[in-house]
Amino acid sequence: MNGKSEKVHGKSMLSKVMIPMLILGILEVAVFAIVMLVSGELTYIKKYSYNLLIEKTANRASYVEYMLNQKTSPVYETAVEINHITEEYLDENGITLDQLSEDKEVNKELLIRSSDALVSLIRRDMVNDAFIILDTGSLYDTDTDTVRAGLYLRDTDAYENSTTDIKDIYMEMGSSDIAHELGTALDSEWAPHLVINDDNDFSFYTVPMESKELYPDKPVYNLGYWSGFSKISPSAQKSMKYTFPLVSSDGRVYGVVGIGLMEKTILKNIPANDFFNESACYIISSDIEGDGIYTPELHSGPIYTRLVSADTVFDENADNSYGIYELRQGTKAHPSAAYSE
């Protein structure tokens, strides 16, 4: 009987101690919350968190832009080299650029002479693709397609280059005779020529070809063009391309030279583990129409597929808080997703 009384008495003492402490703790939390709300501290904390996110994304964007800009100068240098090769070849044979649209052997020889410059461009610029596309007029055209002669080389791993040979480089597009001459293998997605149609985006070729005429007062080295991810054939892997017009000494544009970066290469520069949880990712997008509506080109992080659908709109005119924009699903704002430019 005494033991039972002691147990009840013990419980009573514990309750007398714990209940006031619990009430005191709740009061402290309530007072703290009220102080935070009244003083505006929550707003400052939210703003600080947003600023951290904006700073992180801005730093990463600057890094990616710097990386891409670093890869443009070698393209211009290669264009100058190929222009010299072309002029030298034309002078040797007493012909003009008109032969590009009349003689397939002229195209082949010019591409063979330029092939070493493309291999060098892949190596020193650490890119996946290097290519030349010539303006061959209607020489290769079919009844349904516009066709151009060219040479397109690809190294699927831009950061591991062979120092002794070019066995790690494959030909994506070009004459098989050139592949034999160069000593490189044909890729499984190989095509002999570039077929230009509505199935893929070929702005990497068409825009630089028109740039000299559209911007006659611009220096040639300012006519380079970054395009989005595109394929050179229906089965080829996509790459983001930078192209530069090939311009003769008399100002005639006779083709383009360019580089390409595959998705996996760029993803190495936008790692999802920059963030400490799985509720964020990086997105590279483009404003194609110049209207503030961005089209996603590439993303990192698994959260993307859960937040973004075909109806999602990236609009710089959308509601934002401290530079963080809400995603819109069609005309409605997404309640649980946001992005920073």
What residue ranges belong to the model's regions?
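Extracytoplasmic/periplasmic ligand-binding sensor regions of membrane-associated signaling proteins
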Residues: 170-258
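Juxtamembrane extracytoplasmic/periplasmic/luminal helical "stalk" adjacent to the first N-terminal
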Residues: 9-109, 126-128
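N-terminal Lys/Arg-rich, disordered targeting/topogenic segments
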Residues: 1-10
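Well-ordered, non-membrane alpha-helical segments in soluble/globular domains
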Residues: 104-117, 201-208
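Intrinsic low-complexity, intrinsically disordered coil/linker regions enriched in small/polar
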Residues: 264-341
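Low-complexity, serine/threonine/proline-enriched polar segments
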Residues: 151-210, 299, 309-331
